[in-house]
């Protein structure tokens, strides 16, 4: 049983956080496009970023900021222009964005983190951003998390939010999160934009370690289309407003906090896969019997990212051969004669041998998952046991539909 409970809210559920989201005119659609997360006190900040060699200005800016000072008061997010591949002017725009917000909040620019999402190669519409800063700050509210979550969306169909609460030393500690991501999602860092807030007190180094480990198990295990973005960023702020004793080393309290952080990240990661562009269902790949956990995660990622597996799921075809083929090319050694593959409750292969199974029933299982979009029953569970060791790992993805091609043919990225 989990040591925490789900509560109402999102990034503003922890004490001392406010948020806002407005329409500043950055998007041609007129949808909300400027978001702000704000801590009333200086918060410990941790970050994980894209591994792409082509990076947005905000990524390089925040890397430098966190290396110099692992704390922050505010996160400014613009949606509509990625500000990636924009050269020196893109960098200057990022710097100016931080300075404008700092001036409006009356805090240091060094206390501001930035994130951008949208079309690669397009600079931020700075005139609209300049005009939007004041109303954005004026919109800050303790219940502004929902608006902030909507203002970071691009091709997303739904906002992605969560809030959890636990007890540490007899005092309530809360953690909240929001994320965006629907396309250009592939496990190679944080795979999208995600923001986590917490009111626990924790040391800088430990908070970064916790976030990095949580990312490996969650966001790095998500794939929608095999493309890694130029802008992937994950930030976690912990402001200590719960007034619990500072957590400075691993122990029961640290383990509880890290487990809750991992749960928040996993929820957001699954929400991203569930909302994959054109997706009709979520795929969860559970791999056991691997040489070690890292190997298990690699096999799970490969299966989740296989276009053939994803297409079979969309076609409601219980094609175990595609699952076996993907497992075999994951770069992990195992004896194929030990392979077990299950689709839901249907055993398709055991001891490396294909089995007779209820094919119409298995196909109907896939159809039912597609009809339960955005519900708990929308998950297609694929279980693979390599029969080699005790390693285990999970990855998440989605099916590949005709709509994915249509969306990305029509949408400039």
UniProtKB/Swiss-Prot annotation:
It is found in: Cytoplasm. Heterotetramer of two alpha and two beta chains. Catalyzes two activities which are involved in the cyclic version of arginine biosynthesis: the synthesis of N-acetylglutamate from glutamate and acetyl-CoA as the acetyl donor, and of ornithine by transacetylation between N(2)-acetylornithine and glutamate. The active site is at 191 (nucleophile). It catalyses: N(2)-acetyl-L-ornithine + L-glutamate = N-acetyl-L-glutamate + L-ornithine; L-glutamate + acetyl-CoA = N-acetyl-L-glutamate + CoA + H(+). InterPro entries: Arg_biosynth_ArgJ (IPR002813), ArgJ-like_dom_sf (IPR016117), ArgJ_beta_C (IPR042195). GO terms for molecular function: glutamate N-acetyltransferase activity; L-glutamate N-acetyltransferase activity. The record marks 190-191 as: Cleavage. Its main location: cytoplasm. GO terms for cellular component: cytoplasm. This is Arginine biosynthesis bifunctional protein ArgJ. It comes from Synechocystis sp. (strain ATCC 27184 / PCC 6803 / Kazusa). Signal peptide: none annotated. NCBIfam families: ArgJ, PRK05388.1.
């Amino acid at each position: 049983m989990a040591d925490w409970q789900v509560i109402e809210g999102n990034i503003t559920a922890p004490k001392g956080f406010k948020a806002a989201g407005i329409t500043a005119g950055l998007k041609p659609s007129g949808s909300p496009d400027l978001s702000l997360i704000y801590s009333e006190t200086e918060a410990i900040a941790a970050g994980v970023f894209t591994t792409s060699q082509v990076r947005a200005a905000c990524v390089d800016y925040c890397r430098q900021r966190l290396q110099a000072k692992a704390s922050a008061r505010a996160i400014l997010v613009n949606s509509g222009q990625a500000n990636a591949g924009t050269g020196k002017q893109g960098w200057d725009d990022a710097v100016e964005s931080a300075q404008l917000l700092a001036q409006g909040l009356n805090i240091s620019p060094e206390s501001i983190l930035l994130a951008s999402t949208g079309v690669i190669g397009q600079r931020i519409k700075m005139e609209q951003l300049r005009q939007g800063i004041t109303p954005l700050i004026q919109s800050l509210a303790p219940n502004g998390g929902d608006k902030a979550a909507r203002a970071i969306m691009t091709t997303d169909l739904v906002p992605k939010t969560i809030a959890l609460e636990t007890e540490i030393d007899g005092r309530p500690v809360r953690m909240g999160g929001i994320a965006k991501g629907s396309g250009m999602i592939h496990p190679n860092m944080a795979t999208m934009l995600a923001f986590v807030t917490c009111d626990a007190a924790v040391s800088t180094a430990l908070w970064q370690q916790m976030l990095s480990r949580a990312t490996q198990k969650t966001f790095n295990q998500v794939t929608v289309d095999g493309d890694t973005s130029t802008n992937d960023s994950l930030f976690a702020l912990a402001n200590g407003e719960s007034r619990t004793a500072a957590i400075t080393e691993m122990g029961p309290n640290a383990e509880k906090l890290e487990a809750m952080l991992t749960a928040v990240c996993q929820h957001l990661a699954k929400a991203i896969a569930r909302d994959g562009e054109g997706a009709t269902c979520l795929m969860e790949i559970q791999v056991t019997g691997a040489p070690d956990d890292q190997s298990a995660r690699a096999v799970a990622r490969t299966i989740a990212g296989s276009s053939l597996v994803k297409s079979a799921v969309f076609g409601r075809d219980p094609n175990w051969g595609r699952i076996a083929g993907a497992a075999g090319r994951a770069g992990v050694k195992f004896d194929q004669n030990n392979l077990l593959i299950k689709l839901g409750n249907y055993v398709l292969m055991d001891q490396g041998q294909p089995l007779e199974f209820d094919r119409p029933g298995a196909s109907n299982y896939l159809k039912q998952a597609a009809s339960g979009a955005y519900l708990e029953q929308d998950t297609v569970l694929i279980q693979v046991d390599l029969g080699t060791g005790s390693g285990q790992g999970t990855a998440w993805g989605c099916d590949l539909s005709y709509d994915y091609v249509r969306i990305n043919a029509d949408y400039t990225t």
